Amino acid sequence: CALPIYSAIGCAVFSRFELSNLTVHSLDVRVHKEKQPSSRPLMQVTAHIGQKELTLFVNHWKSKSGGEEETEIWRDWQESVLAQRVHSMYIEGFEENPIVMCGDFNRSVEDFTLQNGSKAKEGIKVVLRGTDGVLVESVSPWLKKNGSFTTEIGSYFFDGNWERIDNFFFLGDIVVNSFGSVTEPPLADEKSIPQGYNIYTDSGCSDHLPLKCEIII
């Protein structure tokens, strides 16, 4: 579990597999006139699955509270931290480890930088931008190879539209067996709209739908 100091909200990993090498990576930005808002650190942990190792990066990026455009700079910084850490793994010789990046990115998948993969027949890739020109290509289960969505239902319903701000991104030898939002009651209503928790009625769960993704490594 990782959370900012003096905060009751953080990120956590529950696992049936052995975990090791937990590290956290925090922002410390002092180049803007605006003071850096409180943010959750990036979690990095290794999962041991049989004879294989999988690196997991858990994210919860800055919300759009305060304005989407006004807060985008902080999500850009968090994107940079993630891209740099993945890039560092390749430099350190861990390029064979499959990598899963997941969490609430507060940025819908189509709003990331998208481009065709560097190899033929790879389809659309989500590109994470680091510093000094570092670019990390990843695969999103939200997207088909032609860039269209794999599901009609997103993870967050806002202003009458589905958003896909909760994400999985994959690198390495990973096959997606199944993926989608979990819409069973009491998580969602009959239209699959998430039922956020109501403190007055003590009902509902979350304004985000959980994602279920089965992968083969």
Give residue spans per PLM region.
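Extracytoplasmic/secreted proteins, especially bacterial periplasmic and envelope-associated proteins
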Residues: 9, 77, 81-84, 119, ...
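Metal-dependent phosphoester-hydrolase catalytic domains
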Residues: 35-37, 88-100, 106-217
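Structured beta-strand-rich core segments of catalytic domains in phosphoester-bond hydrolases
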Residues: 2-53, 57-61
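Short, solvent-exposed loop/turn and secondary-structure capping segments
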Residues: 24-26, 57, 68-69, 111-115, ...
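Metal-dependent phosphoester/phosphodiester hydrolase catalytic core
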Residues: 39, 49-80, 84
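Second-shell loop/turn segments in exported
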Residues: 31-32, 66-75, 153-156, 199-200
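Extracytoplasmic/secreted cell-surface and envelope-processing proteins
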Residues: 7-10, 65-68, 108-112
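Active-site flanking residues adjacent to catalytic metal/cofactor-binding acidic residues
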Residues: 59, 103-104
